[in-house]
From Swiss-Prot, chains A, B:
Molecular function GO labels: acyl-CoA oxidase activity; FAD binding; fatty acid binding; flavin adenine dinucleotide binding
Organism: Yarrowia lipolytica (strain CLIB 122 / E 150)
Lineage: Eukaryota, Fungi, Dikarya, Ascomycota, Saccharomycotina
Pathway assignment: Lipid metabolism; peroxisomal fatty acid beta-oxidation
Cellular location(s): Peroxisome
UniProt cross-references to InterPro entries, sorted A to Z: ACOX_C_alpha1 (IPR055060), Acyl-CoA_ox_N (IPR029320), Acyl-CoA_Oxase/DH_mid-dom (IPR006091), Acyl-CoA_Oxase/DH_mid-dom_sf (IPR046373), Acyl-CoA_oxidase (IPR012258), Acyl-CoA_oxidase_C (IPR002655), AcylCo_DH-like_C (IPR036250), AcylCoA_DH/ox_N_sf (IPR037069)
Catalytic reactions of this protein: a 2,3-saturated acyl-CoA + O2 = a (2E)-enoyl-CoA + H2O2
Protein purpose: Oxidizes strain chain acyl-CoAs with a chain length of 10 to 14 carbons. Also active toward the 2S isomers of acyl-CoA-esters containing a 2-methyl group.
Keyword Cell division assigned: no
Cofactor(s) annotated in UniProt: FAD
UniProt-recorded name of the protein: Acyl-coenzyme A oxidase 2
GO terms for cellular component: peroxisome
C-alpha cells in the first residue's frame, strides 16, 4: 500500500515493520564481523586477564543497587549530589581493600557511567593525595594517612589551587602564608575577594582538610607559591574551623555531583609542619631551602593529564558505540524506488561522519597506553632516586620534562577529540540524540570541563609547542632530546621529502608524511624564534610572537604521535587474526587526518593536488571496508548496556522498544493536564476576555 | 612584595588590585573606540527607528517581574516548564494587540534571554499557524482563527510531523488518514509504535489541537503525506479526546521549558474539512486533486530556516560580547618580569580565537537580513498570485526553489557557527565559562537542537549541494538560474583565475577567490555527476555517490555568500564613520576563512604557498586592529545586562564583584553541612570501623 515501502522490510521471507525490524537487522550486522571480537577486546584491554578483571568489576558495579542508573538523567542537582556522596562512600571501601590496579580499573569504569562520582573521588585520591605524596615528605604523607586520609575516615581532602582571579598562572596566586617565627606557625590569609579560592571540588560539603597553594613569605621575603595542608572543618560536627569561610559555587554546566566551593582564609594559623616539605623546606629559624627544579614540584599534576587521555578513549568509545549501533538499525529515505529505506550507516556521507571518529577512538587508546607506561616508569625512577644520585636526578628531570610536554599536547587534543566525538555522534543520531535518555547532552556537559581544568587546553598546547621549539633549539646545539621528538634528528633528510609515487597505504610513508609536516613547522618556527632572539627579544617575548605557530606545531606533532603509536602497537602486539582489521582503522585515521589538513601537505610540498584526490578515494575505500564490521569494532569495546546507558544504543538493537519504554518509565502517563494546570494553564487558556472598561464621557 | 606583580596595577597614579581593577580597565577599553558606536547599532538594526523600538521592547521585558531571570540557571525542569507557560501566556497578549513587526522584534529578543519560551510560542505561532496558513485555504485559516487560534483562547496548536521512526524523510511517515466515504470523515491512525508522533512540542501539556502529517488514503490509494487538523483535548477540562494517547517525552539535552510529547492516534475520526486543502483537495466523492509543485506545500518550512539564520546572530552576539568583555578585564601571566599581568585580550593567540568569531557574528547578520528580505518578497508574491497566472506561478516556483537551497545552506552553517561561538567563547573564559551563572552551558544545550530540528543540518547541506549541481547542469543547458548562483555564469573566466600579485585586501579579489573555489568544486562535481548519469545511474544514485562533494560545495558556496553579502552591505549602507571599522571586520572574516580552508585555495591554484603566509600575516594584522575597538564592536550589539545574563560579561566590567555576588545570592551561605549530612555524610565520614567478626576456630 505504501509506495515508498518505508514501513515494511522482508528478511529471509519474513516481514518486519519499522518497529520490529531493528533487532533483526542488528543480528545480521553482528554476523558480518569476520574477525574474532574477543581477541580484539583482549588487544584493547592489554590482555585477557585485564578483560576478565574488567568484566568482574563491571558486574559488581551493575549489580550494586546504589549504582543503578535507571533514573540518572532525571536527577536534579540536589539529588545527584547526595547520590554521588553515597557512591563515593561506597567506592572508598574498595580503595582500602583492593590492589591499586583493580582500583584504577574500577575508577575508570565508573568514569564512563558517572563522571561526577569519578571526579569527586578524584578530588581526594587524585588531587589531595597526589599533592601530599608528591610535595610532602614521607613522614608528612604518613602523618596524614594516620589521620584518616588513606580510607576517608574523619578525613576528606580537597585541593585549593585556583582563585577567583587566577587559574593558569600559578605564580600569580595571591593567598599568603606568612611565617610567624614567634609561634612557629604560618598564617594563611586571603587578601581580597579575587584571591578567594574558587572552584574547589569537595569544599562546599565534604572536605575536612585541604592542600592550599599560597605564597610562602618568610621574614618579608616572598618565595613564591608553595603547598600547605590546612584543616577546614572540625572533626565530628563538621563545622567550620575559626577563620575559614566557605561558600557553595552552585550550578555548573555539568558535573553537578561535585560540591565545588569557594574558600576564604582569614588569618588562619597552621603549624610550620603543614608546609609540604619534600622540595621546599622552612626550618624553625625561618631558613628556606628551595627545590632543585620547579617542575618536580608540580610533577603530580601530570597524573591527571595522563589519565585524561585514557578517559577520552573510555568516554569516546561509549558514544561511538551508540551512534554506530543506531546507524545500523535506523533507516531513512529510500535511494531506489520501491526498495526499503536505506540504513543510515550505508550513506557514504554518514560513514565519513562516524568511521574516522571510530578510528580516532581506537588511536587514543594506543597513545594513552604508551604514555601511561612512560609515566609509570618515570614515577618509579623518581621514587627510587637516592638523594645524592646526581646522574639519576638529571635523568629523571629530563624524563619529567619530556612527560610534561608530551602529556600536555596529548591531554589537550584527546579531551578535545572526545568532546568532538560526543557532539558529532549526537548529531549523527538526529533528534533522538537530543533526548536526555540517550545520554549525549549530559555527557557533553560533564565532559567538556576536561578541556579546561588541570591545565587549560589552549595553554597546554602553547606550552607543548614551546617545548617542541626548545627541543629543536637543543638539537641544533647538539644537545640530547627526548624520545618523543627524536624524529627531528632525521629532519635534514626529511625536510624536502615528497611522496614521489610511493604508496599512501604504507604505514611508513604515512608516518613520514606527518614527520615531514611536523618537522617543517617546528623548524620554521625555530628559525623565526632564533631570529627574534637575535633581534633582542627575550625567550618569553619571542614565544609570544610565535603563539600561532606553537599551536600548529603541537597539533601536528601530537597527531603524528597518535598515528605512529597506532601503527607501532599493531606491529608489536596484534595477533594475525586482528591485524588487518586494525590496520584498516589505522590507515583510515592517518589518511583522514591528512585530508582534514590537506593545506598542510600541499604547502609542505609532500603531496600534490592530485594526491589529495587519491587520499579522498582511499578514505572512501577504508570507510567502506570498516563499515562492514562496525558492530564488531564497537562490540570489542565490551561495554554492557549499563555503561552504554542509552536505549538507542543497546546491544540487541531493539532501539525503538527500549527507547519508548524508557521514556514512559521515567514519565509515567498521568493526568493529561500538567501540574500547573490549575495555577497557570487554565486561567490563561480558558480565560473569559474582559471588556475594556472605558468610562463613558459625557462629551456632548 | 610580590615579585610577579600580579596583584596590583597602577592606573593614572592610583593603585588597584585584582579585585578592584576590572571596572577601571573596562572604562579605559571603552574609551578606545574611535567610531560612533550608536551609528554602528543603527547600521546593525537597520536604522534608528528599529533601534529605538528594540530598546523600548527590551525595557518592557526587563521590567516585567515575570521575565526576571535572576534565578534562571537554577530552575529545574518542572519549574522552567511552568514559568515558560506563564511567559507564553503573557506574550500571546502582545500578539493580539501589536503590529507584526513589533511582535517579531519581541520574539527575537526573548529568543536571546529565554530560548525555551521563544520556541514554545513558536510551536503554535510558527509551526501550527504556518502550516494552517501555508497549506490551508483562506476559509480554513479563518475557521481556526475563529476557534481561538489567533489569540490562544481555548486553543493551542502543535505540529505533529516527526514520528519515532521517521524524521527527515517526510515521505516515509506512517500515520494513516483513510477517507471514510460513508461518514465523510478521515480516520487517523498510528499503525505501530514506531509510527508514534514524537518530539511534538506543546503536546505533553498544552495543545488542544494539532496539525498532523499523515498518509492520505482514498479508496485504497495512497496519495502520500498531507496535513490535517486534529483536536487532541477537550476544551475546558483539557482531557484527551477519544482515541488520543499522549505521553511526556521528558528530559532533553536542553529547552526543558517546552513540553515535548508523543501522540498516538487510534482510529480518530475527523471531518473531511480538516484536511488542509490549499493544494491537495478531496471532495465528498473521494476525488483527489494534487498540487502543481510539491515544494509549494512545504513552503512554510522555509520560515523557520530563515529566522534561524537571524537567531544565530542574535545568540552569537550575546556570547561573543561576554567573552570579549571578560578578555578585556582578565589578566593572566606576565610577559615582562615586574610588569602587571597581561590582559588575555592582548595575547595574539586569544585574539585569533575570538576576533574572527566576532567578525563571523557580524557577517551572519548581513546575510540573514538579505535572505530575510528575499523571503518576504517571495511570500508577498505568493500571496498575491492569481490562480490563473501561469507566468507568475513559474516565477514564484523558481523563487521558492532558490529560497529552498539558499536557506538550507544558510540555516545549516549559521546554526553550526553559533554553536561554535558558544562553545569557543566558553572555553575562552576558562573555568568561569563553566559556571552555570555565566550562561554558556545552558545556552549550548538549548541552542544545538537548532542544528537538528526543522531540517537536520547535514541533510540540508546535502540538499543545498544537490541544488548547486542542478543549477550548474541547468546553466550548461543554457537554462536560467537564480541570483544566488549567478556567479557560476562567469565560471569560464574564473576557472583558472589566480591571485597573480593582486592585493589580498581588495574585497573584489577576496570575493573572487571564493567564487573560484566554489565554482571549481561545483563544476568538478557536475562533471562527475554527468559522467555517472552517462554511465546509467539515476539522479538519486549519482547524487549519493557525490555526497562528500555536495557537502563541500554547499559549505564553500555558503561561505562565499556570507563574505559577498558582508562587503556589499557595507558598500551600500554603511556611513563613512563606520565604513572602515566594518571593512576591518569583513576583511578579517574573509581572510580568516581562507586561512582555515587553505588547502582549498592551494589546490585550486588560486593561491601559492607563499600567499598563505601573507594571508596569515593579514589575519594577524586585522586581529590587532580590531582588538583595539572590541568594546565598541560589542557595545554596538546594544544588549543590556539583562540579556547578557552573565556576571563576567557585564557592561561595567566589574566582573569579579558581580560574579561573587551572583554565586552567593543563588547559594546563600547556610550550614557548612550539606542537606544530606545526617543521612549520608556523617554515617560515612565519621563511622567507627567494625572489627572483622571472625569466629575463632579451635584448631589446635
Ligand atoms: C568544574 C571545575 C572544577 C574545578 N576544580 C578545581 C579544584 O578542585 N581545585 C582547583 O584548584 N581548581 C579547580 N578548578 C579550576 C581549574 O583548574 C581552572 O579553571 C583552570 O586551571 C583554568 O584556569 P582559569 O579558569 O583561571 O583560566 P585562565 O587562566 O584565566 O584562562 C582564561 C582564558 O585565557 C586564556 N589564556 C590565559 N593565559 C593565556 C596566555 N598566556 N596565552 C594565551 N591565552 C591565555 C586561556 O586559554 C583561557 O581560555 C576547577 C574548575 C572547574 C570549571
Ligand atoms: C527538542 C526537539 C523538538 C522537536 N519538535 C518537533 C515538533 O514540534 N514537531 C515535529 O514534528 N518534530 C519535532 N522535532 C523533530 C525534528 O524535526 C527531527 O528530529 C528532525 O527533523 C530530524 O529528524 P530525525 O530525528 O528523524 O533524524 P533522521 O532523519 O533519522 O536522521 C538521523 C541521522 O541520519 C542522517 N541521515 C538521514 N538521512 C540521510 C541521508 N539520506 N544521507 C545522509 N545522512 C542521512 C542525518 O543527518 C542524521 O544525522 C523535534 C526534535 C527535537 C529534538
Amino acid at each position: 500500500m505504501n509506495p515508498n515501502n518505508t514501513g515494511t522490510i522482508e528478511i529471509n521471507g519474513k516481514e518486519y515493520n519499522t518497529f520490529t525490524e531493528p533487532p533483526v537487522a542488528m543480528a545480521q550486522e553482528r554476523a558480518k564481523t569476520s574477525f574474532p571480537v574477543r581477541e580484539m577486546t583482549y588487544f584493547l584491554d592489554g590482555g585477557e586477564k585485564n578483560t576478565l578483571k574488567n568484566e568482574q568489576i563491571m558486574e559488581e558495579i551493575e549489580r550494586d543497587p546504589l549504582f543503578n542508573n535507571d533514573n540518572y538523567y532525571d536527577l536534579n542537582k540536589e539529588q545527584i549530589r547526595e547520590l554521588t556522596m553515597e557512591r563515593v562512600a561506597k567506592l572508598s571501601l574498595f580503595v582500602r581493600d583492593q590492589p591499586e590496579d583493580d582500583i584504577k580499573k574500577r575508577f575508570a569504569l565508573i568514569g564512563i557511567a558517572d563522571m561526577g562520582t569519578y571526579t569527586r573521588l578524584g578530588v581526594h585520591y587524585g588531587l589531595f593525595f597526589g599533592a601530599v605524596r608528591g610535595t610532602g615528605t614521607a613522614e608528612q604523607f604518613g602523618h596524614w594517612i594516620s589521620k584518616g586520609a588513606g580510607d576517608l575516615r574523619k578525613f576528606y581532602g580537597c585541593f585549593s589551587m585556583t582563585e577567583l582571579g587566577h587559574g593558569s598562572n600559578l605564580a600569580g596566586l595571591e593567598t599568603t602564608a606568612i611565617y610567624d617565627e614567634e609561634t612557629d606557625e604560618f598564617i594563611i590569609n586571603t587578601p581580597h575577594i579575587a584571591a578567594t579560592k574558587w572552584w574547589i571540588g569537595g569544599a562546599a560539603h565534604t572536605a575536612t582538610h585541604t592542600v592550599v597553594f599560597a605564597r610562602l613569605i618568610v621574614k618579608g621575603k616572598d618565595y613564591g607559591v608553595k603547598t600547605f595542608v590546612v584543616q577546614l572543618r572540625n572533626i565530628n560536627d563538621h563545622s567550620l574551623k575559626v577563620g575559614i569561610s566557605i561558600g557553595d559555587i552552585g550550578k555548573k554546566m555539568g558535573r553537578d555531583g561535585i560540591d565545588n566551593g569557594w574558600i576564604q582564609f582569614t588569618n588562619v594559623r597552621i603549624p610550620r609542619q603543614n608546609l609540604l616539605m619534600k622540595y621546599t623546606k622552612v626550618d624553625r629559624e625561618g631558613n628556606v631551602t628551595q627545590p632543585p627544579l620547579a617542575q618536580l614540584t608540580y610533577g603530580s599534576l601530570i597524573t591527571g593529564r595522563v589519565s585524561m587521555a585514557s578517559d577520552s578513549h573510555q568516554v569516546g568509545k561509549r558514544f561511538i558505540t551508540i551512534a554506530l549501533r543506531y546507524a545500523c538499525i535506523r533507516r531513512q529515505f529510500s535511494t531506489t524506488p520501491g526498495q526499503p529505506e536505506t540504513k543510515i550507516i550505508d550513506y557514504p556521507y554518514h560513514q565519513r561522519r562516524l568511521l574516522p571518529l571510530l578510528a580516532y577512538v581506537y588511536a587514543l587508546k594506543m597513545t594513552a597506553d604508551e604514555v601511561g607506561a612512560l609515566f609509570s616508569r618515570t614515577m618509579l625512577k623518581m621514587d627510587d632516586l637516592k638523594p645524592d644520585d646526581k646522574a639519576g636526578l638529571n635523568e629523571v628531570v629530563s624524563d619529567v620534562k619530556e612527560l610534561f610536554s608530551v602529556s600536555a599536547g596529548l591531554k589537550a587534543f584527546s579531551t578535545w577529540a572526545c568532546a568532538d566525538v560526543i557532539d558529532k555522534t549526537r548529531q549523527a543520531c538526529g533528534g533522538h540524540g537530543y533526548s536526555g535518555y540517550n545520554g549525549f547532552g549530559q555527557a557533553y556537559a560533564d565532559w567538556v570541563v576536561q578541556c579546561t581544568w588541570e591545565g587549560d587546553n589552549n595553554i597546554l598546547t602553547l606550552s607543548a609547542g614551546r617545548a617542541l621549539i626548545q627541543s629543536a633549539v637543543a638539537l641544533r646545539k647538539g644537545e640530547p632530546v627526548g624520545n618523543a621528538v627524536s624524529y627531528l634528528k632525521r629532519y635534514k633528510d626529511l625536510a624536502n621529502a615528497k611522496l614521489n609515487g610511493r604508496s599512501l597505504t604504507d604505514p611508513k610513508v604515512l608516518v613520514e608524511a606527518w614527520e615531514v609536516a611536523a618537522g617543517n613547522i617546528i623548524n620554521r618556527a625555530t628559525d623565526q624564534y632564533e631570529k627574534l632572539i637575535g633581534e633582542g627579544l627575550n625567550a618569553d617575548q619571542a614565544f609570544e610572537v610565535l603563539s600561532q605557530q606553537r599551536f600548529q606545531a603541537a597539533k601536528v606533532h601530537t597527531r603524528r604521535h597518535l598515528i605512529a603509536a597506532f601503527f607501532s602497537r599493531i606491529d608489536t602486539e596484534a595477533g594475525e587474526a586482528i591485524k588487518q582489521p586494525l590496520l584498516n582503522l589505522a590507515l583510515l585515521f592517518a589518511l583522514w587526518s591528512i585530508e582534514e589538513d590537506s593545506g598542510l601537505f600541499l604547502r609542505e610540498g609532500f603531496l600534490e593536488p592530485k594526491d589529495i584526490d587519491t587520499v579522498t578515494e582511499l578514505v572512501n575505500k577504508y570507510c567502506t571496508t570498516v563499515r562492514e564490521e562496525v558492530i564488531g569494532y564497537t562490540d570489542a569495546f565490551n561495554l554492557s548496556d549499563y555503561f552504554i546507558n542509552a536505549p538507542i544504543g543497546c546491544y540487541d538493537g531493539d532501539a525503538y522498544r527500549h527507547y519508548f519504554q524508557k521514556v514512559n518509565e521515567q514519565n509515567p502517563a498521568r493526568d493529561p493536564r500538567p501540574p500547573y494546570y490549575a495555577s497557570t494553564l487554565k486561567p490563561f487558556l480558558f480565560r473569559e476576555e474582559e471588556d475594556d472598561d472605558i468610562c463613558e464621557l459625557d462629551e456632548e
